[in-house]
Amino acid sequence: MSRIGKLPIKIPANVDITCSGPDLTVKGKFGTLHNTIPDAIGIEEIDGSLIVNVKDNTRSNRALHGLYRTLINNMVTGVSEQFQLTLNLQGVGYRASVQGNSIILNLGYSHPVELVIPEGISVEVVQNTTINLKACDKGNLGLFASNIRSWRPPEPYKGKGILYKGEIVKRKAGKSGKK
């Protein structure tokens, strides 16, 4: 039995969970999330918490046990509290702004980079260099944040680029020159 998979998932009072066949729906204050649960995984609700079980104890099913427990826990957390990521733009002239349903990034290219904001993600730009992302779906939030970051990943020589909040770039020394 998986160490993570056997932990119960606490269900907050404002969250409704519906399981019809393989489809799992989680509704909360910040939205609704859907997921398909494989046949090898069973879900039961006991005393205001969800228990994720494995129907037959094969190696592949045990691998899915912890995965689906974590996915369901992230769904419950997302619809009740939301997930948040913060990106910092470090570099001369690096700026961000939100226009309608897209985010405009000035990252030192000859043209501004325009990215469409996916549905379910809210973007807020603070002081032109800090991007706050919020969403109830943790997977889509991380995917969009990594898409933004891929335009200018942090580089080790000057420390410029798009960094996650709290990320420390390991710096390298430049060329030492001719001796």
Swiss-Prot record:
Gene3D superfamilies, sorted: Ribosomal protein L6, alpha-beta domain
Alphabetized Pfam families for the sequence: Ribosomal_L6
GO molecular function, one term: structural constituent of ribosome
BP GO terms, sorted: translation
GO CC terms in record: chloroplast; ribonucleoprotein complex; ribosome
Domain of life, per lineage: Eukaryota
Compartment list: Plastid, Chloroplast
Record keywords: Chloroplast, Plastid, Ribonucleoprotein, Ribosomal protein, RNA-binding, rRNA-binding
Family to which the UniProt record says this protein belongs: Belongs to the universal ribosomal protein uL6 family.
Function: Binds 23S rRNA.
The name this protein goes by in its record: Large ribosomal subunit protein uL6c
Source species taxonomy: Eukaryota, Sar, Stramenopiles, Ochrophyta, Bacillariophyta
